[in-house]
Amino acid sequence: MNASLRRISVTVMALIVLLLLNATMTQVFTADGLRADPRNQRVLLDEYSRQRGQITAGGQLLAYSVATDGRFRFLRVYPNPEVYAPVTGFYSLRYSSTALERAEDPILNGSDRRLFGRRLADFFTGRDPRGGNVDTTINPRIQQAGWDAMQQGCYGPCKGAVVALEPSTGKILALVSSPSYDPNLLASHNPEVQAQAWQRLGDNPASPLTNRAISETYPPGSTFKVITTAAALAAGATETEQLTAAPTIPLPGSTAQLENYGGAPCGDEPTVSLREAFVKSCNTAFVQLGIRTGADALRSMARAFGLDSPPRPTPLQVAESTVGPIPDSAALGMTSIGQKDVALTPLANAEIAATIANGGITMRPYLVGSLKGPDLANISTTVGYQQRRAVSPQVAAKLTELMVGAEKVAQQKGAIPGVQIASKTGTAEHGTDPRHTPPHAWYIAFAPAQAPKVAVAVLVENGADRLSATGGALAAPIGRAVIEAALQGEP
């Protein structure tokens, strides 16, 4: 072989090697990125050529696909959009997907390995490929009640969230976030409609795309006194333990004074029992109780209830709830009443109520009840999973007793005849100027108190003025409406 042919052969071989290397790089290292690139029209056309599966709740359709005559064969439809947007999320040509549309995408688009047999059968029979279906744990009656109550609870719509759990299993029965949005607009095949909707949502200062139930954390205020009380009881305190009834208390090591709501004393005597302090939600008494109990015991109890540890997906991603640093006694006093750096998601606060309702055992919360194939054959069913024991049955029973007493004091409107509720309200200061910022209003509860079927947490964000934005006035009626819906038809 002469030199010229040899050079040509080497050049051709080098080009072949380069082509093979490029193909390997594309297939192995960059394929996922190329598939995920929104500019990849081939992937989009492929995805929208398959009928995406349904998302359901209690037999109701929350999301489904309909055939179109356009370039993209199927359009996503959300029949009750604002109510269920925190659950379904959206599936968009331009803006990807969120919530269950993202978390369960392999099932919904049919690519999940458990649907391989179905895909193979479709290939050989020539059937149009279809995705699987996701059946949620949401109870439509409870979800709708939570949404309706939030829209009417603040002399108009409230900003905030409602979470309802089944204490014995961890099923998420309601997941409400307000304000919400219409995912149909983001799922539109019209680029202009999508873009305008996205712009409006992004410009809205109320952040309707934010799932306040699981993605945001808030100071829990007096609802955290449940944790402080649990820590004290576990350390040997009793309900008759005497605490200060003074209207104000100095925070150790500082010049700051902390006061009770409205600056009122907690009773006519110099001291008050733990029972009375819990029922009346006395800040000064709980500052003293927290300092007596100690930072280590308080933090340990908070961890037992799931704080300060990354939560498992439901399968939606959940923000971590935290106690925050407790460097000194002043910080401990503030932490004991759910202020300082304590921050919880509404889901975490609902878990606290559900744990007490379940005798001290925390069940892992979950949103997906079952996954089904395109033919509705069952793929998997979720069962309740015990995460941990937070407190003893005795402590849980005592907390229930105290919360029943607190409900009787807090009950202003929305009482349910014949139903005993165990609850705790909270009013949480926040922001850089808390004295001039509307506080958050909280309500956590479960019912019936002695045989719980449902546990709830309600957050009303930036409720109103400082005197009317209490958990009892704003959040509690919403929570009771949710409980009433949950107990309809119960014996």
Curated annotation (Swiss-Prot):
Name of this protein: Peptidoglycan D,D-transpeptidase PbpA
Active site: 222 (acyl-ester intermediate)
Periplasmic side: 29-491
Domain notes: The apo form can adopt multiple conformations. The beta5-alpha11 loop near the active site is a flexible region that can adopt a variety of conformations in the acylated state of PBPA and appears important for acylation.
Source organism (scientific name): Mycobacterium tuberculosis (strain ATCC 25618 / H37Rv)
Bilayer-crossing regions: 8-28
Domain of life: Bacteria
Annotated stretches, region: Transpeptidase: 160-484
Function: Transpeptidase that catalyzes cross-linking of the peptidoglycan cell wall. Required for the regulation of cell length. Plays critical roles for the survival of the pathogen inside the host. Required for both bacterial survival and formation of granuloma structures in a guinea pig infection model.
Reaction(s) catalysed by this chain's protein: Preferential cleavage: (Ac)2-L-Lys-D-Ala-|-D-Ala. Also transpeptidation of peptidyl-alanyl moieties that are N-acyl substituents of D-alanine
InterPro entries: Bact_Transpept/Beta-Lactamase, Beta-lactam/transpept-like, PBPA_dimer, PCN-bd_Tpept
GO molecular-function terms, A-Z: penicillin binding; peptidoglycan L,D-transpeptidase activity; serine-type D-Ala-D-Ala carboxypeptidase activity
Topology in the lipid bilayer: Single-pass type II membrane protein
Regulation: Inhibited by the antibiotics imipenem, penicillin G, and ceftriaxone.
Annotated disulfide bonds: 266-282
